[in-house]
């Protein structure tokens, strides 16, 4: 797992160097660069497969085709064997090398052959191809600057090129105030775009003008396109998950697992126990030792014989982590993600690779909104009305999204749209981008077996009622049945199935509420009213976090200044000499 950067249209050596250096945390093991006539590409490497000879960029059989990739390709051995039979010559043991040979063989359709998570760039003479995996597990951002295209794994790398000026996109900010993220592929910075999941981007120069085309290569299957009897579907799902976890254990380094005590992480830990002979490290975080997540995780770890590590997050550490968390997240994200950020640093002390249960809620229907259509949309409607009344409308894409979910329609129609929308945007923007940001900030690769495309497509081909029983209010019905049929005699595993979903990350809810109260106490009464962006926010704490985001990304181009602390920033915003917190 790695970080990639590049410039197409002009191979600016200085800008490429600054961009690549800014991603050192994503790849502390090695660095490589390629400079062609029109394309410059950089790579920072975290060595996991092909440790001894997997340096990038990697050249294909043709001398003008190069690839840089941030990837884990789980079927690379089979692909490599097939490509060798077709006459291709491999120079490394890296999984990334199959991409450049697939491109030489199949062109842009090379992505259709890949099982895994990836974001990559192929330089092909005077043409560039960018690609992102089907569900956006790996990030890829780009910006058009004149006749050049900049791309990178992180926004801060684009800013460090010094070729574009960071400016807030107020329409994207309005979207974020309503939905929690910009609607569509845009970001909070004007002109900076995230390549959508399941898409490629091609770029060429025509008469010194940049010409780009974004193309979708993956769509979700229709519900009930390959239905099975419910019991058979549950049994097939268990075997599919077993095969998927086996493929995700591929590495030349030790692999851990996050363990929250909930259903998703429990399944992964249980399958790892079946498939892995050696010791397994499991990691849990909570705000105190008696937190329900910690207690349940301890039970499971003891039953499965895991080497269990528990991190306790204090309020003082919570507050102190906010600046580095936002620097990694590259968005004024909800502070609930701080627990994961801290946990990733702890995991990164021990291992380079970890399995995580992200994606199971979106694939199998794990949120309250899957059984109650107003669970989430009620607040969105209220926020949208407030913003429009103040002359700050959301984007057309944001309005279409909300209209599609609030329309008067039978519940199955609503549910079908919800699954599709959540897989398209919420999963990527609210979860996967933050998971990647926090893990890679700790030089840690997080793997998400529930988002293997075989698992996702299997689930989506089954009837909606298999995943969610909206009449009885049962979420993740198929996934729960798979666990009960397979491990129904294991008490603590059954406990994870029957346990009421209390919502992640519960481990920091108390700290977050305490931080909100602290902001209300120390920030001026007119803090929201007097700020040019105050109308976008409901609470002082939210505006404070946004202003911190501006400090880091607009003023400092994604680089957190040395010695910068959250308490100093709060004191500055509060116009007070100093602040301190306990606990």
What kind of region is each of these model predictions?
Residues 63, 94-96, 168, 237, ...:
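A generic structural signal for residues located within well-ordered alpha-helices
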Residues 351-361, 365-367:
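Short acidic/histidine-rich active-site segments
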Residues 1-4, 160, 190-196, 210, ...:
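Adenosyl-5′-phosphate
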Residues 289-344, 348-350, 369-379, 408-415, ...:
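ATP-dependent adenylate-handling ligase core
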Residues 235-256, 346-350, 426-434, 552, ...:
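Phosphate/ATP-binding catalytic cores across multiple sugar-kinase/actin-like superfamilies
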Residues 89-93, 287, 378-387, 501:
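A conserved active-site-flanking secondary-structure segment within enzyme catalytic domains
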Residues 1-328, 340:
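Cysteine-centered catalytic environments shared across enzyme families
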């Amino acid at each position: 797992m790695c970080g990639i950067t590049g410039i197409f249209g002009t191979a600016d050596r200085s800008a490429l160097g600054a961009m690549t250096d800014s991603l050192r945390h994503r790849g502390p093991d090695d660095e490589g660069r390629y400079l062609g006539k029109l394309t410059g590409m950089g790579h920072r490497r975290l060595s996991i497969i092909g440790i001894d000879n997997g340096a990038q960029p990697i050249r294909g059989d043709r001398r003008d085709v190069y690839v840089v990739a941030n990837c884990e390709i789980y079927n690379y051995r089979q692909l490599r064997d097939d490509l060798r039979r077709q006459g291709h010559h491999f120079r490394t043991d890296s999984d990334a090398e199959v991409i450049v040979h697939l491109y030489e063989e199949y062109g842009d359709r090379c992505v259709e052959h890949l099982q895994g998570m990836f974001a990559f760039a192929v330089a092909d003479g005077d043409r560039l191809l960018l690609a992102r995996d089907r569900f956006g597990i790996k990030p890829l951002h780009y910006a058009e600057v004149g006749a050049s295209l900049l791309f990178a794994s992180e926004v801060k790398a684009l800013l460090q090129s010094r070729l574009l000026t960071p400016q807030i996109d107020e329409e994207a900010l309005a979207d974020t105030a309503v939905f929690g993220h910009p609607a569509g592929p845009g970001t909070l910075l004007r002109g900076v775009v995230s390549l959508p999941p399941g898409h490629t981007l091609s770029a060429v120069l025509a008469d010194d003008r940049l010409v780009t085309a974004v193309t979708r290569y993956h769509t979700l299957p229709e519900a009930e396109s390959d239905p099975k009897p419910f019991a058979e579907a549950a049994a097939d799902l268990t075997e599919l998950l077993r095969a998927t976890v086996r493929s995700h254990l591929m590495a030349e380094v030790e692999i851990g697992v996050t363990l929250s005590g909930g259903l998703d992480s429990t399944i992964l830990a249980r399958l790892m126990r079946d498939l892995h002979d050696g010791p397994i490290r499991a990691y849990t975080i909570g705000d105190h030792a008696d937190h329900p997540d910690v207690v349940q995780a301890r039970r499971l770890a003891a039953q499965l014989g895991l080497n269990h590590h528990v991190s306790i997050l204090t309020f003082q550490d919570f507050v102190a982590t906010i600046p580095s968390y936002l620097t990694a997240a590259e968005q004024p994200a909800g502070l609930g993600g701080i627990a994961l950020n801290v946990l990733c640093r702890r995991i990164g002390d021990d291992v380079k690779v970890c399995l995580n249960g992200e994606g199971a809620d979106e694939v199998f229907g794990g949120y309250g909104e899957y059984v109650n259509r107003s669970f989430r949309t009620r607040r969105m409607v209220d926020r949208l009305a407030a913003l429009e009344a103040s002359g700050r409308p959301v984007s057309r894409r944001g309005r279409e999204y909300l209209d599609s979910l609030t329309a008067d329609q039978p519940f199955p129609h609503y549910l079908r749209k919800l699954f599709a929308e959540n897989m398209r945007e919420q999963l990527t923007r609210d979860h996967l981008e933050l998971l990647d940001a926090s893990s890679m900030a700790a030089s840690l690769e997080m793997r998400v077996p529930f988002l293997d495309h075989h698992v996702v497509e299997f689930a989506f081909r089954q009837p909606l009622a298999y995943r969610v029983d909206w009449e009885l209010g049962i979420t993740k019905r198929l996934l729960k049945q798979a666990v009960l049929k397979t491990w129904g005699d294991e008490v603590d595993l059954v406990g994870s199935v029957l346990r009421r979903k209390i919502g992640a990350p519960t481990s920091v809810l108390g700290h977050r509420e305490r931080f909100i109260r602290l902001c209300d106490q120390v920030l001026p009464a007119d803090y929201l009213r007097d700020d040019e962006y105050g109308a976008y926010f409901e609470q002082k704490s939210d505006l404070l976090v946004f202003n911190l985001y501006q400090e880091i990304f607009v003023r400092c181009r994604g680089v957190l200044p040395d010695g910068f602390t959250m308490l100093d920033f709060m004191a500055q915003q509060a116009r007070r000499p100093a602040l301190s917190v306990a606990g």
